[in-house]
Amino acid sequence: MRKGVDKRAMAALSAGHLFTDVNQGAVAALVPFLVAERGLSLAAAGSLVLAATLSSSIVQPLFGHFSDRRPLPMLMPLGVALGGLGIALVGVASSYPLILLCVVLSGLGVAAFHPESARFANYVSGSRRARGMSFFSVGGNAGFALGPVITTPLVLSFGLPGTLFLVLPASFMGLALLHELPRLLTFQPKAEEAAVGRKGAKAPEHWGPFARMIGAVTVRSFVYFGLVTFVSSYYIQVLGSSTLLANSALSVMLFAGGVGTLVGGPLADRIGRRAVLAVSMLLLSPLIYAFTVSGPLLGMILLALIGAATIGTFGVTVVMGQEYLPGRIGVAAGVTMGLSIGLGGIGAPIFGALADNQGLPTTMLAISALPLIGLLLALSLPRSPARSSD
């Protein structure tokens, strides 16, 4: 096994992750424009985020299951291209059902990309999987953060049809990944090693701790998507800020999450994955509450800390899942990166309905209470997979 991360291979995978998740970030950035120009309610807007989340996540374990049995590397270039095509068509869709369909199409492309790319991220990381997965994850974090940065100027300049430009970077990245595939394939385990891994004979699988960890990830996802969906609207409706400043605040949170990811991976290697996850949950409740009583500028500082605490553990939990299920790393990645996040995305329309009826300040307070549940679940996990028991 390699001692370190292969830089060229990881750069290709992380860049693919970035260009794929730009499309997911674009959905959240389009919410204020769709509300203003298409007359969508906050609940309907939240449902778009839910559709993007579910379509990009629920089927990920299925892709992971098939890739555990037979690798499907072509899903990486095809996934990023399809993700860009779907979101590009959102701005020219003439009705809410068509908008929803385009969002789902984009989400399916995202779903196809993630399990297979996470598998190869595991392969090219050698013995430093937490560090390698943090590099892979930060690509997705950066992509989600760039979604609003890229989308907002396009829509401000060209109207909603400006989303058509988003197909260009996705197509470019799809071709780049297609070019890199032959080299990436050299990192796959030998056939006999892969067969042993699929049977799970090398190490036991710990479904009990895995399920509890997924519970914590789901809670984190409720918090994450609640904030991603309504931070911009909170700035506009509660703090009286412009759309540009509102989406900038969202980008600050997401970019800080990328920094948190780079810190969280190496830190988890030193003090333990469980400790990093638990501390992040412990910090989130007071930080989100402080945000609700702050102005726009202090709010941005707090959002940076919130983003680091929320997003910084994404890579850590992917590695935890793969360690709990060492013979099913595709399924583990699909559930950790997909299904659990999709379940958390159910919170978007729930929080949207709460915001429509009780207001955004009350909604933010509700979001601030959730990390306490995640903290309890994180503390119930074993300190290492070797100590796990079902």
Feature locations, PLM:
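Extracytoplasmic gate region of multi-pass secondary transporters
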Residues: 27-28, 208-258
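Helix-loop-helix hairpin linking two adjacent transmembrane segments in secondary transporters
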Residues: 136-183
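Residue-level signature of mid-helix packing/kink "hotspots" within the transmembrane helices
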Residues: 25, 53-61, 144-145, 254-262, ...
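C-terminal membrane-cytosol helix-exit motif in multi-pass small-molecule transporters
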Residues: 168-194, 377-382
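Cytoplasmic helix-loop-helix junction between adjacent transmembrane helices
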Residues: 103-139
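Conserved MFS/SLC helix-loop-helix module at the cytosolic interface between two early adjacent transmembrane helices
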Residues: 58-96
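C-terminal transmembrane helical hairpin of 12-TM major facilitator-type secondary transporters
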Residues: 268-317
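A late C-terminal transmembrane helix in Major Facilitator Superfamily
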Residues: 326-357
